[in-house]
Amino acid sequence: MIVTNYIPNAVKNLKLTSAFRGYNPGILDCIETSIDGRIIVVDDVEGTHISTNVEDLHRCCMCVNPNNNEIIVLPLDKRLIKERKGGMADGAVFDEQKFVFLEFKDHALGNSDTAIADTYTKASSQLSSALQLFIEKLATNSICVDFLSSVNVSCHIIVSDKFPRASALEQNMRLLFSMENNGVELSFEKEIMFNSRTGRYDK
């Protein structure tokens, strides 16, 4: 469901409509919301969005939402953000307490150590670019929101179940990413838990 006349609390708290005023389409024309207990999020030609197709499970990000909070799905690359030097993360999922940037590499094959490293390096760069954009936008004088203090921010690289995992490389990349990005966590987990209770129905 695309929301156009209601601003979710998670969006209001971060003043995202003001921070990205003038963007076309705007925040409210991009987002989807759901209070389902399990939310399948994918990225394809339509951008990052909610899917109801169980065939997408092998390549999706699964948001687990036991308290039925209002979860926001925001497509970024080529949707809200048309172009940015350094690239852009595919999208984000968030509620009032947690904000997660997503970069999908679900079509990557990872058929060599070099290919795996290249996939992860490009994805982490795109996530870092998105993170810095939000930090900068929300820190402007007219917004005055400390993004990293307002919500629990993390970044996730999503690969398909067939992609070969490299635990040592992933650990090194986690450490490097955290050092270069104000302590923000980089994760390779496809499942994201939203378990805080929020006043999702407040307007």
Locate predicted features.
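Basic, amphipathic N-terminal segments that precede the first structured/catalytic domain
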Residues: 1-84
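Short, conserved catalytic or adaptor-binding loops enriched in Gly and charged residues
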Residues: 63-64, 147-148, 177-181
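Catalytic micro-motifs at enzyme active sites that drive phosphoryl/nucleotidyl and oxygen chemistry
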Residues: 77-83, 88-90, 140-145
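Short acidic, S/G/P-rich loop/turn micro-motifs used as interaction or catalytic elements
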Residues: 79-83, 107-110, 162-166
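Catalytic centers of nucleases
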Residues: 84-93, 119, 123
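Conserved catalytic cores of phosphodiester-cleaving nucleases, focusing on short active-site segments
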Residues: 91-93, 98-109
